[in-house]
Amino acid sequence: MSSRQDKEKSVNVQVLLRCRPFSDDEVRSNAPQVITCNDYQREVAVTQTIAGKQIDRVFTFDKVFGPTAKQRDLYDQAIIPIVNEVLEGFNCTIFAYGQTGTGKTYTMEGECRRAKASLRCCCSFIMCLPLPKGCLLFVFLSSKYLQSGPKGQLPADAGVIPRAVKQIFDTLESQNTEYSVKVTFLELYNEEITDLLAPEEISKAALEERQKKPLPLMEDGKGGVLVRGLEEEIVTNASEIFSLLERGSAKRRTAETLLNKQSSRSHSLFSITIHIKEATPEGEELIKCGKLNLVDLAGSENISRSGAREGRAREAGEINKSLLTLGRVITALVEHLGHVPYRDSKLTRLLRDSLGGRTKTCIIATVSPSVHCLEETLSTLDYAHRAKSIKNRPEVI
């Protein structure tokens, strides 16, 4: 049997566990540590006290990254092989899952929250200037991921998305092949899908009017879904993707809560589609099509502890509802139930092919080491541990 046939067999969802360091607030309050990570044995131990008795629980994952792990450690050990699969023609999904404030966006994007805050203030101003559309915006945005480190290198805190982009183009540009790359970027907020790459209007009033138009989610007739009207941008190099990523990320909804100073209030899905034209030894033309879905989920949230009120409480409720549905889908797949509730939320409809479908999937579960987050940490660990049993059947497109 060929290696290609081997790869098309069913494979388990890969689950990584990442525990962030203590936050400054947790250090100041001397919060007890309840999580111990053993990266070598791929284990996470949780210590809790019930009725005066100490109980330890141990969870095993495909890979474990403790508080001292660097962004590059996670990427080099776990993500490089996935991106290589995309370049071979597979569809792959990587998504971060966990409580709010545990480092999902940091893991996926890197330390760019301050840049985003500046972008939110500047984007509307820039788009109102009497310049060719996007002229100054591209210069302003494209610099962020290339500012630090040696020329052509990413900053040390760059996350999965910029590292994957760089790997893709480094590989494509080193090969003597024809290729094309397209990207999309969407946000799911309160069960409404919006295009984060939608063209902006010069008029400020029109900008506010059109910036957040919800898009319909449609069945594609093949068991998957598509988003009607989603802008697909053709890109020719990594810098262009970084520009689009910054532009879209600046529009994502965030808010300060008691648990997270810049909490994502929406789920986001950044997709990269690659077509590669190759010639076989017989002189025939072969086209490979791979797709990489990079998902940053909003964090599950204890509404009373986060201090959410009114509109923020509704946001948190919608986030928790969609994540609860995701948990039910995981349970149904693991227990081989007859009905899997994909259609109960738009999040699970979007992720349908990534959970029990034709896509190779990697879940990065993020947790806090603090006792104050113990309940949410155990929930994340339980669901992530169960997700290891989900089987997908990847196909080359």
Predicted regions and their residues:
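Short acidic, low-complexity intrinsically disordered linear motifs used
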Residues: 10-22
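Conserved GTP-binding G-domain of TRAFAC-class P-loop NTPases and closely related GTPase folds
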Residues: 223, 227, 244, 359-361, ...
